[in-house]
Swiss-Prot record:
Record: active site: 133
GO molecular function, one term: dCTP deaminase activity
Entries under InterPro entries matching the protein: dCTP_deaminase (IPR011962), dUTPase-like_sf (IPR036157), dUTPase_trimeric (IPR033704)
Catalytic reaction list: dCTP + H2O + H(+) = dUTP + NH4(+)
Entry keyword annotation includes Chaperone: no
Organism encoding this protein: Campylobacter fetus subsp. fetus (strain 82-40)
Pathway: Pyrimidine metabolism; dUMP biosynthesis; dUMP from dCTP (dUTP route): step 1/2
GO BP, one annotated term: dUMP biosynthetic process
Family: Belongs to the dCTP deaminase family.
Protein purpose: Catalyzes the deamination of dCTP to dUTP.
Pfam families in UniProt: DCD
Residue runs in coiled coils: none
Protein name according to UniProt: dCTP deaminase
C-alpha cells in the first residue's frame, strides 16, 4: 500500500472528480491552510455545524441519537463551547477509487489550540461529503473558521482493488450530503 503524491491526487481529481471542488495549490496566507500538498490534501470545513448541548438533558446514544443533543449553526465562525464537541462537514465532495483508502488527520494549527479533529477513514468506493468531528479540549471557547482548512487527507492505494467496496455493500453513509448524524441500520 503506497502513499500517493500531489501529482496522483491532481490527476485523480481533474480526470475522475475524486475531490470537488479541487484546489490545485496550497492556500495559506491569512487563513488556516487548505488545498493540495506534497502527499495529501488539506480539506476545508463548511459553514454548517451541529454543536452539542446539554439543554435537552438526554444521553448521547449512538444507537438512538436524539437530535435535541445538538443545536444547528450556520456561519463563518463557529464557537465551540469549552470541553464540548461539534459536527461539521467538508466543503469538498469525495469520490473514492475502489483501490484507495484515505486517512484524515487534524491540522497542527488547531491541535496546538486544543482542538482535536476526528474523521473515520474514507473507504474504497465511498462517495459523499465527509462529516467531521471537532472536540474542544480546552476550558475556553474555541473558534472554527468555515471555508478554511481543518484536516489533511492522505491517500493510500492498495495492491489491488478490494473485493467489496463501500458502494458495493451500500454503506450507510454513502452519498451523504451535509452533516450526517449517527445511523444504525435496522
Amino acid at each position: 500500500m503506497g502513499l500517493k503524491s500531489d501529482k496522483w491526487i491532481r490527476e485523480q481529481s481533474i480526470e475522475n472528480q475524486m475531490i470537488e471542488p479541487f484546489c490545485e495549490e496550497n492556500i495559506g496566507k491569512g487563513v488556516v491552510s487548505y488545498g493540495l500538498s506534497s502527499y495529501g490534501y488539506d480539506i476545508r470545513v463548511g459553514c454548517e455545524f451541529k454543536i452539542f448541548t446539554n439543554i435537552g438533558g438526554t444521553v448521547v446514544d449512538p444507537k438512538n441519537f436524539d437530535e435535541k443533543n445538538v443545536v444547528d449553526f450556520i456561519g463563518d465562525i463557529c464557537i465551540v463551547p469549552p470541553n464540548s464537541f461539534a459536527l461539521a462537514r467538508t466543503v469538498e465532495y469525495f469520490k473514492m477509487p475502489h483501490d484507495v483508502l484515505a486517512i484524515c488527520l487534524g491540522k497542527s494549527t488547531y491541535a496546538r489550540c486544543g482542538i482535536i479533529v476526528n474523521v473515520t477513514p474514507f473507504e474504497p468506493g465511498f462517495n459523499g461529503h465527509i462529516t467531521i468531528e471537532i472536540s474542544n479540549t480546552t476550558p475556553l471557547p474555541a473558534k472554527i473558521y468555515a471555508n478554511e482548512g481543518i484536516a489533511q487527507v492522505l491517500f493510500l492505494q492498495g495492491d489491488e482493488p478490494c473485493e467489496t467496496s463501500y458502494a458495493d455493500k451500500k454503506g450507510k453513509y454513502q452519498d451523504q450530503e451535509g452533516i450526517t448524524l449517527p445511523r444504525i441500520l435496522k
